[in-house]
Amino acid sequence: MTYELPKLPYTYDALEPNFDKETMELHYTKHHNTYVTKLNEAVSGHPELAEKPVEELVANLDSVPEDIRGAVRNHGGGHANHTLFWSILSPNGGGAPTGDLKSAIESEFGTFDDFKEKFNAAAAARFGSGWAWLVVNNGKLEIVSTANQDSPLSDGKTPVLGLDVWEHAYYLKFQNRRPEYIDTFWNVVNWDEANKRFDAAK
């Protein structure tokens, strides 16, 4: 088996005017594609690894041979992180969570606005490249951030929502205005997908 880019559930321009077409196309066809290519190269001599879902690989890095562990961490993480990212974006997104996820967010963080403020702060404070996440850890929601392409899965945490704060995710449209990009993210969040991920992780 070889790892492949997931099919985008929308066109490159579908998230306009929030996320621009050029960034989406470059992000998917160049950046994500490179992670997939490099991951396939890393595991090419290890067919037993290539049979595993990428999420399983990054969740169990200790079982990856040491000579390719760094490559799998970086490129496998990049593949897993971006695959989730595309799925939790939608041209019909925005609004607020519903159901059990809404209740869990309010229980853990206060109001939805309180949650967004805390998530935004984590995303803005990540120095350099990385991600901000809403994760399930031991049945409870947490907000965490990771460096580079590190995945919460590697720490035993299941991501429900993730935001890429690498400059390649926003610089063409937002330049150095990361907080504006973070605010815009909420307009395109696919809460139906986040709900499904939360239900599966509980």
From Swiss-Prot:
Q: What class of enzyme is it?
A: oxidoreductase
Q: Cross-referenced PROSITE patterns, in alphabetical order?
A: SOD_MN
According to the lineage, what is the superkingdom?
A: Bacteria
State the EC number(s).
1.15.1.1
**Cellular component GO terms, alphabetical:** cytoplasm
Q: Which parts of the sequence bind Mn(2+)?
A: H27, H82, D164, H168
Q: Name one Pfam family in it.
A: Sod_Fe_C
Q: Which InterPro entries would you find in this protein's record?
A: Mn/Fe_SOD (IPR001189), Mn/Fe_SOD_BS (IPR019833), Mn/Fe_SOD_C (IPR019832), Mn/Fe_SOD_N (IPR019831), Mn/Fe_SOD_N_sf (IPR036324), SOD_C_sf (IPR036314)
Q: Cofactor binding mode, per the note?
A: Binds 1 Mn(2+) ion per subunit.
Q: Name one GO molecular function term.
A: superoxide dismutase activity
Q: Which UniProt keywords apply?
A: Manganese, Metal-binding, Oxidoreductase
- Cofactor(s), names only, from the UniProt record: Mn(2+)
List the catalytic activities from the record: 2 superoxide + 2 H(+) = H2O2 + O2
Summary of the function given for this chain in its UniProt record:
Destroys superoxide anion radicals which are normally produced within the cells and which are toxic to biological systems.
> Which PANTHER family did the record assign?
37S RIBOSOMAL PROTEIN S26, MITOCHONDRIAL, SMALL RIBOSOMAL SUBUNIT PROTEIN MS42
| Oligomeric form and interacting partners | Homodimer.
Q: Which family does it belong to?
A: Belongs to the iron/manganese superoxide dismutase family.
The protein's name in its UniProt record: Superoxide dismutase [Mn]
Organism name: Listeria innocua serovar 6a (strain ATCC BAA-680 / CLIP 11262)
From the broadest rank down, the organism's phylogenetic lineage runs: Bacteria, Bacillati, Bacillota, Bacilli, Bacillales
| Gene field | sodA
